[in-house]
Every structure is written in C-alpha cells, then in structure tokens.
Amino acid sequence: MKNKAAEVGEKVGKTGKATGAKGKSSGKKKGEKRTKQKQPRRAAQKYNPYICPDGMSLEDWQRALRCQAAMRDDHLAVQAPDKAGDPFKVVNIKKQTEHLVEYYGPKSEYNVCSCLDFKTSGLGTCKHIEAIGIAADGRYARKRYAKPSENKLYIDYVEGRRIRLMSRGENGESIKRLSLDYGFDEEGYVLEREGIHEKIVEFIAKARDIDPGFVTTDETLDIIITLRQNKARKKVLEDKYTSSSLDGLLKASLYPYQREGIKFGFEHGRVLIADEMGLGKTIQGIGVAELLMREGFVNNVLVVCPTSLKYQWKREIERFSGKDAEIVEGNLMQRRKIYGFDVPYRICSYNSMLHDVKGGTDIKADLIIYDEVQRLKNWDTQIAKAARSLKSDYVVALSGTPLENKITELYSVMELVDQYALAPYYKFIADTTERDATGRVVGYRNLNHIAERLAPYLIRRRKKDVALQMPPRTDKTLFVPMTKEQMEIHSENQFTVARLIEKWRRTMFLSEKDRKKLLMSLSIMRMVCDSTFVLDQRSRHDTKIAETMHIIDEMISNGDEKVVIFSQWERMLRIMAQSLDKEKIGYRFLHGGVPSAKRPELIEDFLENPQCRVFLSTDAGST
C-alpha cells in the first residue's frame, strides 16, 4: 500500500483509474523489436440523469449515475487510511469538503459513507464510495479489509435507516444470542415495537459486559435519544396539557387551532406549520418554543427570517413570552459574539446566516425556527445549503406557501425539517412526476401519498377551516361621491373603455395599441376616484380625504385606537399626510422609497409611541 503522502491528491481520472499509477512491465526482452499496438478502450456508457433506460431498474440506474458522477468529477481526491480500521477520506478540492468512507470492496454491504446521499438514497453506495473503487481499483479494500471484524450497533441505511447489530468480532455469537432476547431478529435488525429504545439501552450495557470493545455508532445513539425524547414529549402532553391548559403559556389568548398547532409542534419536534397568511404562524412558533423550554427540552432558540422581519420577531417574542431576544447583527466578529450570548432567543436574517456559515461560525441552537421558509425552495442556492448545514434537535418551519410552482420545492423545504421525510429524492421524483420522452415534467401523480408521508411533519389550516373559531370581522364599505371635475375625467375614460370592450366583442381581437389604451383608461378611472391630484399633481378635486379625516377624528377622540391606511397611490397618501400635519395628528409614512433598514423603526414607533396614531402605507408595507 502507498503511504499517505503518496495517496493525498490522487484524483479520479475520467478513465476510471487513479492518475499517477505505475504501469506494468511490457515484458519486452532486450534488443527485441515489438510493434506497439493500441488497445481499443471501451467507452463507458453515458446515462441520462432524467430518464431511466428501458430494462434497467430505478435503483441500478441511480447507482450507475453515481459511478458516472465519480468518473467525471476531476475535483475528487482519495486519501487511503494510514492503518487498518481507519476510514478512507474523499476530498472535494474545489468545494473544500471531506467525507469519511468505510470501504470493504466493490458492492460490499458493509461500505459506509458520511455523506447525506448515502444515508438517504438506500442504494448502498454514493459518488464517494464509487470514487474509491475507481481511483484505487479497489485494491486496498480487497487486500486488507475484506470484511469488518467487530461487534457494533450501527444504522443500516440501505434498509431504511434501521438499527442493526453486527456481531463479527470476538464473542460475536454470544452477543447475537443475547440480542434475540432484546427485540432483534436473526438478521440483527431491531424489531419495531413499543418501548424498544429502553430495551436497546439495556442490551448495549449487557453487550459491553461480554465485549468491552462493543461499539455503538453516534448515529445509533442519536436515534435512540430521539425515540426517548419523542416518548417523553408525548407523555407530557397526555399527563399535563389539555387543549385549554395552554392558555397561560403566552401573554395572549390563543384560538383553539393555534393551541392545536403548538401541541402538534411540541409532540412531533420537527414540523412545518403551513397555515394560510393571517392565522398566526408566528405566535404558534413562539408557543412551541415556550412549551419546549417550560418542559426542559430546549434552552435556546434561533429564529432565521428575512431581514425585514427581524425586529418584528423581536417585538413579538418579547411581547408574547416576556423574554429577551437578541438580534444577530454587526460585523462577522460581533455576530459571532452574539451567537454565544446566554439568551433564550437569538434572531438572524437568512443573509447573515449565510455569511456566518461561510465564515466558519459554529451556529448552535436547541430549536431553530425558519420563518418564510419558502425562500429556501431552490435546493441548490447558497442560502439553502447553508441552512441545511445548521444542526438542532428541534425545527419549526413556517410558511403560508410551502409549494408554489414545482413539487421539488416541497422536497427542498422538507429537507430542513427532516432530511428523511420524503427521501430518497430520486424515488420521490419518480413516484410523483410524469415525464415525456425528453425528460421534461408534464404532470404530477400520487400526491395523496405525499400527504400521507407528511402527516407527522406538516399541519396546515385555511381560514375557511377555522372561521368558526375566530371572532367575526366587520367589513364596512363607505361610498364617497366624486366631485364634478372627477366625474368628467371618469366618464371620458369610461366611454373609451366601453368602446374598446365593444370592439373586442365584435372582432374578438384588440391590437397592442388598443390593449394598452384599455389598461391605461381603467387605471385613470381608478386613480381619479381618489383625487385628480393623483393624475396631474397640479389640481386637487376630491372628497375622500375629508371623509377619511372625519373617520380618523372620530376614532382617536374616543379612545387610544390607532389607524392603518393603505393606498396603492403614494400621491394620495401624500395628500393624506398634509391633512394629518394640518390637524397635528402624529403619523408614520411607509412607502417604496423608505430604505429597508429604516422600516422597522417606523413600525416600532407606530406601535409603541402613544402620540403616533396613524400609519400610512403603500403596497410596500404589506410584505
């Protein structure tokens, strides 16, 4: 075997052999002439990553794709182990990533890689395992590590992430016999049954009595701990919390569906709350965090959200929980310091999180709340990759639209919640999409099966579903007459609209010029209903401002109510602001020209300043 120095940087060539390997002697005798003949090279078959070849199983096709990827990736380098028992290392020189591989030869059932693809695909291989076989021709594994010879409890990812016993070491037969009394079958797999995690813990202790070197992998311990925590949380809900007993959890009254969402998040631990906008996903996320803290399952929470929502999250956390929340901001060193603060809540933006991950900051949290998680719907973006690198025991993802266009977006979002929820990816795509001969997606199928798989992870309610649980909303439409000048402009454009619509009805066609004229006339009719000032900024004929001021005067004189006014037209709000100035009524004005950094300050002042009674906003304030 080559020493480590000789192995480092041994790249995978596209021919499938390690570069720099010594060739064999030709066997030619001295002085003998021999014609050098080129041996024909067998071209490797190329596989389409979108279309499974006829006569080939889905799994075999995926294994072939991983072998093909290993052959084509010139940035992979294989490092052989220094001694028997140590893993191989496969380094991506370009991405500066490293994966550990236990390699025992081509197609060995004992091969294991630390990468996510190996753990989720169920194929028993990955690009890194194939790279070792190509780069070294498998010679290291076949000669020195034919089969493992140890007793250990590990995760079999090929059989669906099941706990399995390997009993190939000294006293292995004794350990195997012992395992049959603790819920294992003849093949070494743990049988699914109630309370099995407790029996596994007891088995590990007795197995170590037989073999002090008995190994339990970290992944196995993680699963055992997760099973124990799941059972503990479920028991807490059954023993201590009814639907009404959550009322004192937050400094706010909760609707029944919100209590249901909090209990769902607490019980399942890693969830996506996908309620429609306006149903209070934020308060449910905070409620899950508070319940987990109260029962001792978490100590700290990290909220990752869009930049514009950082201060809103801070206000809501402090308002509903009464606890401190620190916003992660400043330069890299300042942000790194804030991550280490001993506070219950920390809040960072998606962009800051990306820079901190790339900068090497070790971001840790017991619970991570991802707000507006649909922003991570594109799997291959840097922000999505950085978010997937964050580790936590609990996750609450919030989104009103977890699926917008493509079904792959849902898979990307669910990887943040639980990377095994919909895995493996290739099977998910094969089961849910219809493709044409070119591999283009032309339809979807089996969507009901996705809903079944997501049941332990996703809860979604629509407004119509919970309407009876919510207080009635009072909608009141006030009709305001237009002035003579407004009516003249409105009628003129109304005539143009009527003429063009009649033309379309006769010919079923409008030219591009007529279409633009139609849209322009409709817009003018809408604008002039507010004020002629919105059109020309010279004249001002309107009645709506006076009526609005009358309503504002009536509301603020009878209590401490505050008023929010939306308008599509900034010019209309400018007139409104002039009237408020004249009456000396405090207000804040949010429009598209206000920098994002200053918007939280405007909202904060409106909410907290008793002298600020009115908030004016264009469409910019609705996001």
What are these model-derived regions, one by one?
Residues F297-N300, K314-R315, R319-G322, D342, ...:
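Conserved P-loop NTPase motor "coupling/switch" region that bridges the ATPase
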Residues V304-I347, F589:
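Conserved nucleic-acid-binding Ia/Ib motif block in the N-terminal RecA-like helicase ATPase lobe
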